Regions:
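His/Asp/Glu-enriched, well-ordered alpha-helical/loop segment
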Residues: 1, 281, 302-313, 366-454
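N-terminal metal-binding scaffold of metallo-dependent hydrolase/deaminase domains
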Residues: 1-99, 459
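Acidic, glycine-enriched loop/beta-strand segments at the rims
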Residues: 24-35, 58-76, 365-366, 416-423, ...
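Active-site metal-binding motif and surrounding structural segment of the metallo-beta-lactamase
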Residues: 93-115
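Di-metal (Zn2+ and/or Mg2+/Mn2+) metal-binding site signature of metallo-dependent hydrolases
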Residues: 111-132, 288-290
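Alpha-helical scaffold segments that flank or form the walls of functional sites
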Residues: 112-113, 130-181, 187-202, 227-234
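Histidine/acidic residue-rich metal-binding segments in metalloenzymes
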Residues: 191-205, 221-314, 318-342, 359-384, ...
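C-terminal cap of metal-dependent C-N hydrolases
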Residues: 445-503, 513, 517
């Protein structure tokens, strides 16, 4: 298919994309942007040099007169030697264009331009196993059990093929950074971390790949094993993780694996002390349920403060925030703010899993998302991410962050009164939480020319079609990447007979012995 913009010649080191529609909040422009946004989903954004360069005159963008009601602005972007050389407000024609100083001129036709995406919470090691070991009930408990069953099929060869298939898919959709949680038990961990290291090196320069150890909180009862895990994570330059109050029964005495009763605070202290000793950042699964009793985020926040932890903390899911009273919600969010926690919402997966009837005959009554706008009001950084794709926890998905953004807008009503800062939730904010540097996730003069051009010209157009004809630019080069075909997975998925999974209705022993691994 012919691209809707003819790319510059591959040898061209200088070109200008005119008439690109860009969210003001992902541009490096004058500090006036702090007066124009409506919803803050990135803590201290107006103070960060990563987001707004103070008194920048080179950008020549006046947000008062150029941005529309959704914070979109029409700009010209000049790329030189793989970097963004200049960003300025679009004009019909300017002197630089007439005398050739802007290089080849390309017309974006007012199409939306975004920085490349950062997907901060995924599980690519489990990807594309949904048909092999099917979650018959579609529930969180059913996912746990069928995921355990699928373990018999794992080898380094098939794991490599599935994980790389996912990376190729994300890259073709315009993602430049992925953080994946990795199964880290004795058998699977012996495979996942070496394969992760191999792929991280292979994909260096295309996708920044980060790994998080995935363990339930009760695992940390074993001091020797938990210390060895921290040592393994450190050796692989990873992030330490734990699932806290993160099952259907999270926050209650019926969850011995992730809530852990009276031992919860002691175990959290152990997690933080290991992170301090081994100088590791932390990434938790927390409160993936609709239980008012589930207050894992509060306990993590208090543990961070109690242990004077200074590293980066990310907390994914946080669904039970929607079940809290107004008073408790305020207490939890204020604690998370003090602990400098970044919250990640996984709307697609939690729409599929949460509040599902195990018999399948009832419609869910609540949404599996935290209270995103209330979190933003407390000035807590928020990210949106893919989570699982085509596995036991979500039978669909393609690591397309535009789809994640689009559906999050619909699910959480992020578009009113204005989308404001929310584009940062899939670009700038996760890049900062992942420590990717000052220009990643931004369109910034002097930064890498890494961005995605869409044909849709406003959000209503962008979100109404798949944008399958999007154009990917990396380091100034136009990338001819396409999503891989599913038949590439046939050699590993067809060699195994489909696994017979758990019965639709679980018995009580199953319920008490489930172990959350999402």
């Amino acid at each position: 298919m012919k691209p809707w913009i003819e790319p510059p010649e591959s040898s061209s080191s200088l070109y200008t994309i005119k008439n690109a529609t860009v969210p003001m909040v992902v541009l490096s422009v004058a500090d006036k942007t702090s007066h124009h946004t409506t919803t803050n989903c990135n803590k201290n954004a107006s103070e960060s040099p990563d987001v707004a360069s103070t008194n920048s005159s080179s950008s020549k963008i006046d947000p008062y007169y150029s941005a529309d009601r959704d914070g979109l602005v029409l700009v010209d972007i000049t790329v030189k030697d793989g970097k963004i050389d200049r960003i300025k407000q679009s004009e019909d024609k300017e002197e630089g264009e007439r005398n050739g100083q802007l290089g080849t001129i390309l017309d974006a036709k007012k199409g939306v331009c975004m920085p490349t995406f950062c997907d901060i919470h995924t599980h690519v090691d489990k990807s594309h196993t949904c048909e092999r070991s099917r979650n018959e009930s579609g529930s969180l408990a059913g996912a746990d059990k069928s995921c355990e069953i699928d373990e018999i099929h794992w080898t380094e060869e098939e794991l490599t093929l599935r994980m790389e298939f996912s990376l190729k898919t994300a890259y073709a959709h315009g993602t430049s950074a992925i953080r994946t949680h990795l199964m880290s038990g004795p058998s699977q961990g012996a495979m996942t971390w070496p394969v992760f290291m191999k792929l991280r090196e292979k994909w260096k320069g295309r996708i920044e790949l980060q790994g998080v150890s995935l363990s339930i909180l009760s695992f940390f009862k074993d001091e020797h094993a938990s210390r060895n895990l921290a040592r393994t994570v450190k050796g692989h330059k990873g992030i330490l993780g734990a699932a806290v109050s993160c099952s259907d029964y999270g926050g209650t005495d019926f969850d011995p694996h992730t809530t852990c009763g009276d031992e919860l605070h002691t175990l959290l202290d152990r997690v933080f002390q290991l992170a301090i000793e081994f100088e590791l950042d932390l990434d938790f699964h927390v409160d993936e349920n609709g239980n008012e009793e589930s207050k894992g985020l509060l306990h993590i926040s208090n543990a961070a403060i109690r242990n004077n932890y200074k590293g980066q903390i990310v907390c994914g899911h946080c669904c039970s925030l929607a079940a809290q009273t107004a008073e408790n919600l305020q207490i939890i969010l204020q604690a998370a703010n003090r602990a400098n926690i970044t919250i990640v919402s996984l709307p697609l997966v939690n729409q599929w899993l949460q509040n599902r009837c195990e018999f399948g005959e009832k419609t869910p009554r609540r949404r599996g998302v935290p209270l995103l706008k209330e979190i933003a009001t407390e000035n807590i950084p928020i990210c949106l991410a893919s989570d699982n794709i085509r596995d036991q926890f979500y039978g669909y998905g393609d690591l397309d962050m535009l789809e994640v953004f689009r559906l999050s807008v619909f699910i959480a009503h992020l578009d009113r009164p204005s989308l404001g800062d929310w584009p940062k939730a899939v670009t700038t904010t996760p890049a900062q939480a992942m420590g990717l540097g000052k220009t990643h996730g931004l369109l910034k003069e002097g930064g890498a020319a890494d961005f995605v051009l869409f044909r849709g010209r406003q959000y209503s157009e962008l979100f109404s079609r798949s944008q399958h004809d999007r154009l990917i630019i990396r380091n100034g080069q136009w990338i001819a990447a396409t999503v891989p075909h599913y038949d590439e997975l046939d050699p590993i998925l067809n060699q195994h007979a489909l696994t017979k999974t758990q019965p639709l209705v679980e018995n009580n022993n199953d319920k008490e012995n489930r172990k959350t691994t999402v």
